[in-house]
A protein has these predicted regions:
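Active-site-adjacent loop/helix surface patches within enzyme catalytic domains
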Residues: 71-74, 79-99
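DNA replication initiation on ssDNA origins
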Residues: 1-69, 78-86
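Helical (often loop-to-helix) elements that flank the catalytic cores of nucleotide-handling enzymes
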Residues: 82-90, 110-126
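Hydrophobic side chains in beta-strands
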Residues: 58-60, 74, 109
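Histidine-centered divalent-metal-coordination microenvironment in nucleic-acid enzymes
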Residues: 71, 95-121
Length: 126
């Protein structure tokens, strides 16, 4: 758990949650997402990693407007995962692809040290 907490370090006074409500015809999971203004606890992390309860959405931007990671959320269906991953490899982009809970694709960009959230947003838009 500590490795995940370090990799996905973010705001510690609030987090996102999502309650699934089924699938659309195109395969995307539907549901409600919202912000919970409470401390992110080890119990929340462990429940999330165990696949229990509502999801835990770490807010990447910390209180000082820096972040150690960013994410591109691709929710265009159908998704050709192989084509996107091959493009990432071909272009040698520093992105880590992961299938999202909704059936989409998350492309993560990680940093060893916190950097300006504005810079991360600019780089992910390039």
């Amino acid at each position: 758990m500590e490795e995940f907490k370090n990799i996905f370090e973010g705001l510690d006074v609030a987090y996102g949650q999502h309650q699934s409500e089924g699938k659309r015809a195109d395969g995307k999971q539907e549901g409600k997402s919202y912000i919970v203004k409470k401390i992110v606890t080890d119990d929340l992390w462990q429940s999330h990693l165990d696949g229990e309860g509502p999801s835990l959405g770490i807010i990447p931007i910390m209180a000082d407007n820096t972040s150690k990671w960013g994410c591109i959320d691709i929710d265009t269906y159908p998704i050709d995962y192989r084509k996107i991953i091959n493009s990432i490899r071909k272009l040698k982009l520093p992105l880590v692809p992961c299938r999202s809970k909704s059936g989409g694709l998350h492309l993560f960009l990680f940093f060893k040290n916190p950097v300006s959230a504005k810079l991360i947003r600019e780089k992910l838009r390039e």
